[in-house]
């Protein structure tokens, strides 16, 4: 599947927000967005007044790039969220949070969503005892995710465990660090999305 090849720090600077795309680096003073909080390029420091449409578009771009999702797939998530009962924007964020790669990132078994996606594809995890390699799988309450026995001493996994101490675990997940095991104990709510997303702007964009 196609993925972004642009430098991750440039993406954060363009979107005007820290998207935590570089793992541990994002939690240090080396973060490019912290050091240069303006868009990349010769005219990056110039702030342009944006139309309502541009603001909505930027919010959608920021959200899908944070979760590492391409446009067509993101649109499918929105369509399903719009068909469900409840608030469309909150349904959308809940579905994005329940992706397997994001869940693994939230559990602290990877330093970034992109790394989590790669680790899933390489089969480093089991879901309810079965090996999985599909990052977009939707987890549900009661699901148990574990690092496979043969991969528990992987330097990547061990490094991620150090990062989670600074990041914390969201309330909808339960993690047993020593066993490298996590469990989904609730569905993620709007409050569990620890990132400044205005999902209503996305709803307005797709409702045009």
UniProtKB/Swiss-Prot annotation:
Record SUPFAM superfamilies: Alpha-L RNA-binding motif (SSF55174)
GO biological process terms, semicolon-separated: ribosomal small subunit biogenesis; translation
Spans through the membrane: none
GO molecular function, one term: structural constituent of ribosome
Gene3D superfamilies from the UniProt entry: Ribosomal Protein S4 Delta 41, Chain A, domain 1, RNA-binding S4 domain
Domain S4 RNA-binding: 98-161
GO cellular component, one term: small ribosomal subunit
Keyword set includes Ribonucleoprotein: yes
Keyword Nucleotide-binding part of the UniProt annotation: no
Keyword tags: Ribonucleoprotein, Ribosomal protein, RNA-binding, rRNA-binding
InterPro entries the record matches: Ribosomal_uS4, Ribosomal_uS4_bac-type, Ribosomal_uS4_CS, Ribosomal_uS4_N, S4_RNA-bd, S4_RNA-bd_sf
Pfam families assigned: Ribosomal_S4 (PF00163), S4 (PF01479)
Protein family membership: Belongs to the universal ribosomal protein uS4 family.
PANTHER family, per database record: 30S 40S RIBOSOMAL PROTEIN, SMALL RIBOSOMAL SUBUNIT PROTEIN US4M
Assembly and interaction partners: Part of the 30S ribosomal subunit. Contacts protein S5. The interaction surface between S4 and S5 is involved in control of translational fidelity.
HAMAP family with a match to the protein in the record: Ribosomal_uS4_B
Function in brief: One of the primary rRNA binding proteins, it binds directly to 16S rRNA where it nucleates assembly of the body of the 30S subunit.
Name listed for the protein in its UniProt record: Small ribosomal subunit protein uS4
């Amino acid at each position: 599947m196609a993925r972004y090849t642009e430098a991750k720090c440039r993406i954060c600077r363009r979107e005007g927000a820290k998207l935590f795309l570089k793992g541990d680096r994002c939690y240090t003073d080396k973060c490019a967005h912290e050091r240069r909080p303006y868009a990349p390029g010769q005219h990056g420091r110039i702030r342009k007044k944006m139309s309502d449409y541009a603001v909505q578009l930027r919010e959608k771009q920021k959200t899908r790039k944070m979760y590492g999702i391409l446009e067509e797939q993101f649109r499918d998530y929105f369509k399903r969220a719009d068909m469900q009962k409840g608030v469309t924007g909150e349904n959308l964020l809940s579905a994005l949070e329940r992706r397997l790669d994001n869940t693994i990132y939230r559990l602290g078994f990877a330093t970034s969503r992109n790394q989590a996606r790669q680790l899933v594809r390489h089969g480093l995890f089991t879901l309810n005892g079965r090996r999985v390699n599909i990052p977009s799988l939707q987890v549900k309450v009661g699901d148990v995710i574990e690092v496979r026995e043969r991969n528990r001493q992987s330097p990547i996994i061990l490094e991620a465990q150090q990062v989670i101490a600074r990041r914390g675990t969201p309330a909808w997940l339960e993690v047993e660090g020593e066993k490298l095991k996590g469990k989904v104990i609730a569905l993620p709510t709007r409050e569990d999305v620890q990132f400044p997303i205005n999902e209503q702007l996305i709803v307005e964009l797709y409702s045009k």
